[in-house]
């Protein structure tokens, strides 16, 4: 199935690219998410007419993500207190939601979907470098310090 991409899609293409994808991927993901339209002649003409508007909107989203990344870098580190045992093992764990809430409380709006924990939840006290994925072109990181709650 031929579609026109309305956004940059990893390993597929960028804005305005006409690509061939499996019909299920187009019907179940690209089209409902608004990331692509069918590549009919009418849609091609309509897209070319709106191309500047779409590019401006994407540039605005990118600029917003870069501004948020600068705020995260300026924040440098965030501290989370959690109950733990004598050896530094936490009672429970610190997940993406906890980290996102701590960063948001520190003044930078972050959602749990933007926090990346490739090794899973944090289960001990210490300092951890956490990746933050704000946009497909904007990644940053922040130091999370987990301390024992008094």
Swiss-Prot record:
This protein's GO CC annotations: ribonucleoprotein complex; ribosome
Q: Name one GO biological process term.
A: translation
List the InterPro entries hit by this protein, alphabetically. Ribosomal_bL9, Ribosomal_bL9/RNase_H1_N, Ribosomal_bL9_bac/chp, Ribosomal_bL9_C, Ribosomal_bL9_C_sf, Ribosomal_bL9_N, Ribosomal_bL9_N_sf
The record's annotation in Pfam families points to: Ribosomal_L9_C, Ribosomal_L9_N
Q: Which GO terms describe its molecular function?
A: rRNA binding; structural constituent of ribosome
Q: Which UniProt keywords apply?
A: Ribonucleoprotein, Ribosomal protein, RNA-binding, rRNA-binding
Entry keyword annotation includes Hydrolase: no
Membership in a protein family? Belongs to the bacterial ribosomal protein bL9 family.
Role of this protein = Binds to the 23S rRNA.
Name the UniProt record assigns to this protein? Large ribosomal subunit protein bL9
The taxonomic lineage of its organism, from the top, reads: Bacteria, Pseudomonadati, Pseudomonadota, Gammaproteobacteria, Alteromonadales
- This protein's encoding gene: rplI
């Amino acid at each position: 199935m031929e579609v026109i991409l309305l956004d940059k899609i990893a390993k597929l293409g960028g804005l305005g690219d006409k690509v061939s994808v499996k019909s299920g991927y187009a019907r179940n993901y690209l089209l409902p998410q608004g990331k692509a339209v069918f590549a009919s002649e009418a849609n091609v003409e309509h897209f070319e007419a709106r191309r500047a508007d779409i590019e401006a909107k994407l540039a605005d989203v990118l600029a917003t993500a870069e501004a948020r990344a600068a705020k995260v870098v300026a924040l440098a580190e965030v501290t989370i207190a959690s109950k733990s045992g004598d050896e530094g093992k936490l009672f429970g764990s610190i997940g993406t939601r906890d980290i996102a809430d701590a960063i948001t409380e520190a003044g930078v709006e972050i959602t749990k979907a933007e926090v990346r924990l490739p090794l899973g939840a944090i289960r001990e006290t210490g300092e951890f470098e956490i990746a933050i994925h704000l946009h497909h072109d904007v990644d940053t990181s922040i130091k999370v310090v987990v301390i024992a709650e008094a």
